[in-house]
C-alpha cells in the first residue's frame, strides 16, 4: 500500500525496526523513523531482521517529529496507544493515512498523542492486565488491516 506510512517514534530495539523494514518492503508502505534511535542503522540485528529487503523498502529517518510532520504534510495521523478507547479495527483506513507508534519501553508520550497533527488514537485489543504487544507485531497488524480494507492493492 504505497500511500500508507508507518512512523516509529524513537524506537529502541533494532530487530523491531528491521522487521518493520521488511513489512514496508512487502506491503509498499513507507517507514519513517524519528530520532533519537536506540541503535545504529548498520546494527547487525536490524540487518538480520530485515533480511535482504532493505533495498526494497522506502525508509526515511527524521531528526525530530516536527520534521516528520513537515515531510508527511496534511495527512490523517492515527496514533496507536494502549490508552485509547477506539479499536484499530473500527477505523475506516484511507489512502495516505499515517500510522504512528511509540517506542518499545514506554509507547507514545502523552504530548505526542495530544499533538494537533494526530487526528485519532486507537488501540489493538488484548487481554486485560497485559502491558503491550511487540512494536513490529503491532505495526504489522495495523498495516495489514488497512491494506485488507483496500483489497490488497498491488498484492498477490
List PLM regions with ranges.
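Post-transcriptional modification and biogenesis factors for structured RNAs
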Residues: 1-156
Amino acid at each position: 500500500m504505497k500511500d500508507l506510512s508507518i512512523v516509529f517514534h524513537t524506537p529502541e530495539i533494532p530487530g523491531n525496526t528491521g522487521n518493520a523494514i521488511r513489512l514496508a518492503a512487502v506491503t509498499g508502505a513507507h517507514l519513517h523513523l524519528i530520532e533519537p534511535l536506540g541503535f545504529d542503522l548498520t546494527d547487525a540485528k536490524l540487518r538480520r531482521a530485515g533480511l535482504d529487503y532493505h533495498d526494497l523498502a522506502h525508509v526515511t529517518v527524521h531528526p525530530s517529529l516536527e520534521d516528520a510532520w513537515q515531510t508527511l504534510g496534511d495527512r490523517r495521523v492515527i496514533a496507536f496507544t494502549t490508552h485509547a478507547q477506539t479499536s484499530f479495527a473500527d477505523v475506516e483506513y484511507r489512502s495516505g493515512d499515517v500510522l504512528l507508534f511509540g517506542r518499545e519501553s514506554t509507547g507514545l508520550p502523552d504530548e505526542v498523542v495530544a499533538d494537533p497533527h494526530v487526528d485519532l488514537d486507537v488501540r489493538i485489543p488484548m487481554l486485560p492486565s497485559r502491558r503491550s504487544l511487540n512494536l513490529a507485531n503491532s505495526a504489522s497488524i495495523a498495516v495489514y488491516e488497512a491494506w485488507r480494507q483496500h483489497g490488497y492493492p498491488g498484492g498477490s
